[in-house]
Amino acid sequence: MDSTILIKLSGESLANKQKSLAIDYELVRQIGSQLKEIQNLGHKILIVIGGGNFWRGTSAAKNGINRNTADYIGMLGTVMNGLALDSVFRDLGIKTRVLSSMSLDPRICEYFVREKAMKYLEDNNVLIFVGGTGRPFFTTDSAATLFASEMGANIILVGKNNVNGIFDSDPKINPNALRYDKITYNQVIEKNLKVMDSTAFSMARDNKIKLLIFDIKEKNSISKLIKRQIKHTEVY
């Protein structure tokens, strides 16, 4: 098996609120161990990381901070998360490259150039994309579908916090909500179900990228998802 997958991680998935940790390094190590297993199955791995454990641009904008500025602060939060992933993954013996949509000091991380990124990927590096799209008013969901499209990934794993798929109603409110095992892009639109923001969702649909929605908080969920051993929703 030889395919390229992109894993969309929220910043919150790295946090441990009970321990008041913005980044729980034990959780990051668990993610890294799963990546090694996935690489051994022949997959090439891309990661897009959010920054919500540090900052949420939309919330800050509502409290009086200029939306452009708020979003750029959020992008810097993704850089912090990406560097944390990079450090832990390297300690686990995983080859990684942190690539930014924004121009930063090269001592911090590299600016994304597709040709170089493809070479790193061929050399079996896990690529960690930070900085979102590099522009305000776009979410990291949009960054995920953008990088998946550019890098030729055919699957995006969308990790949610304590929600193991797409439901016909909010499972946190309705205990009888039904989870979809599989659903088409058109059905999601017709039923007005929330998966990603509309820009990201449209890009994934147009580029025929399969989405797998799963609970990132479930133990070993990423490696289990690759083997289809946990509950999830497939959007195709």
Curated annotation (Swiss-Prot):
GO cellular component: cytoplasm
Its EC number(s): 2.7.4.22
Primary subcellular site in the record, as a coarse category: cytoplasm
Cross-referenced CDD domains: AAK_UMPK-PyrH-Ec
Pathway: Pyrimidine metabolism; CTP biosynthesis via de novo pathway; UDP from UMP (UMPK route): step 1/1
Binding locations of ATP: 8-11, 52, 56, 161, 167, 170
Binding residue positions for UMP: 51, 71, 133-140
Keyword Kinase recorded: yes
Reaction(s) catalysed by this chain's protein: UMP + ATP = UDP + ADP
Subunit and partners: Homohexamer.
Family: Belongs to the UMP kinase family.
Protein name: Uridylate kinase
